[in-house]
Amino acid sequence: MAISKEKKNEIIAQYARHEGDTGSVEVQVAVLTWEINHLNGHIKEHKKDHATYRGLMKKIGHRRNLLAYLRRTDVNRYRELIQSLGLRR
């Protein structure tokens, strides 16, 4: 199931850097993290769903690239985002 508009708007409101911000790295990573967590639950239940697994891997790669970009450009924002999302324990 795709992310609902309400949930996506809630995530955007929480991680936006300013009013109307939908494309900042923080927002993109937060939305991808929600989608990845959602797909992980699906994969645990449907182990042979290889198409979904491939989509999950693409989303993980996209998030990894965005996080690498953020780490290169602004380490403080990167650390705050990682901590708030609960990544890299």
Curated annotation (Swiss-Prot):
Domain of life of the organism encoding this protein: Bacteria
Classification via InterPro entries: Ribosomal_uS15, Ribosomal_uS15_bac-type, uS15_NS1_RNA-bd_sf
Gene3D superfamilies: 6.10.250.3130, S15/NS1, RNA-binding
GO BP terms, alphabetized: translation
GO molecular function: rRNA binding; structural constituent of ribosome
Keywords from the named record: Ribonucleoprotein, Ribosomal protein, RNA-binding, rRNA-binding
Cellular component, GO annotation: cytosolic small ribosomal subunit
Record note on quaternary structure: Part of the 30S ribosomal subunit. Forms a bridge to the 50S subunit in the 70S ribosome, contacting the 23S rRNA.
Role this protein plays: One of the primary rRNA binding proteins, it binds directly to 16S rRNA where it helps nucleate assembly of the platform of the 30S subunit by binding and bridging several RNA helices of the 16S rRNA. Forms an intersubunit bridge (bridge B4) with the 23S rRNA of the 50S subunit in the ribosome.
Family: Belongs to the universal ribosomal protein uS15 family.
Name of the protein in its database record: Small ribosomal subunit protein uS15
Source species of the chain: Streptococcus uberis (strain ATCC BAA-854 / 0140J)
Lineage: Bacteria, Bacillati, Bacillota, Bacilli, Lactobacillales
Gene: rpsO
